[in-house]
Swiss-Prot record:
Designated name of the protein: tRNA dimethylallyltransferase 2
Coiled-coil ranges (or none): none
Residues that bind ATP: G10, P11, T12, A13, S14, G15, K16, T17
Function: Catalyzes the transfer of a dimethylallyl group onto the adenine at position 37 in tRNAs that read codons beginning with uridine, leading to the formation of N6-(dimethylallyl)adenosine (i(6)A).
Keyword line: ATP-binding, Magnesium, Nucleotide-binding, Transferase, tRNA processing
A Pfam family this chain is assigned to: IPPT
Subunit structure as annotated in this protein's UniProt entry: Monomer.
Family statement: Belongs to the IPP transferase family.
Catalyzed reactions per annotation: adenosine(37) in tRNA + dimethylallyl diphosphate = N(6)-dimethylallyladenosine(37) in tRNA + diphosphate
Top EC group: transferase
Site positions for Interaction with substrate tRNA: T100
Gene: miaA2
Gene3D superfamilies: P-loop containing nucleotide triphosphate hydrolases
Organism: Syntrophotalea carbinolica (strain DSM 2380 / NBRC 103641 / GraBd1)
Amino acid sequence: MTCNLLVILGPTASGKTRLGVAAARALDGEIISADSRQVFRGMDIGTGKDLSEYGDVPYHLIDICEAGSEFSVFDFQERFCTAYADIRKRGRLPVLVGGTGLYLDCVLRNYRLVKVPENPVLRAELDPLSMDQLAERLRALKPEQHNTTDLGHRERLLRAIEIAEGEKACGETGPVLPGLRPLVFGVRWERAVLRRRITARLKERLDAGLIDEVQALLDAGVAHRMLEHYGLEYRLVSQHLRGELNRNDMFQKLNSAIHQFAKRQDTWFRRMERQGVQIHWLDGAGDPLQGLLRVFMS
């Protein structure tokens, strides 16, 4: 079986972007980002776009939306299909790189997604419910819920329930990519080493101007509410800029939140394996590119 999609996944700060670019360069490929926040323009430092690493390697699904807008899993799958077909048509290898588990899953497990409009009747039914009641309803609809940001933000929670109910009502449609033959690699580090990498990278991002980036988004009209929606760096830096956290508290909370996020990513990847996705794990501390090429060429 010949691979027609190379996939490189891993937790935050694992070096998957660097490996993806190196693999794309070695195999005449183009990158498709599987990161739920890199689609937004102006969110560069906080999302780790690292565009300088790409050089002459073409990339897709980065900087395609205005910050402050919404971008759903359905939108990602639709855009992925377009980018994938375009790359294959030109005889090159699509290289899907990222750590957003739901985006990876919707491609690798061929989710049947539908575009779900807002449902005012359902919204009226949900409006009296508490956050705990809403979270319980979402878990009942989607027991595998991965994105805990949805559970702490009322508007995201309402929309997640709306989408889950809409998908349930519509049922399955036809397969999205019936001819997909993916080869999946993951970048793995010892936990203590990854923790050090996460903390070091956070310090680098703050030194590189992360706070100024968030302030620029606010100055451009992106509401604090949307920054809360985007989670992690954007939520906590926004709270710092509102005077709710001093810089040290912001750093400590953000560092802890990113460590927890990396654990949830690992949990999601293990779940993917249990559900039949074969992941070839590479040692981030070794030479992951050579390991990848050996498997690819075998």
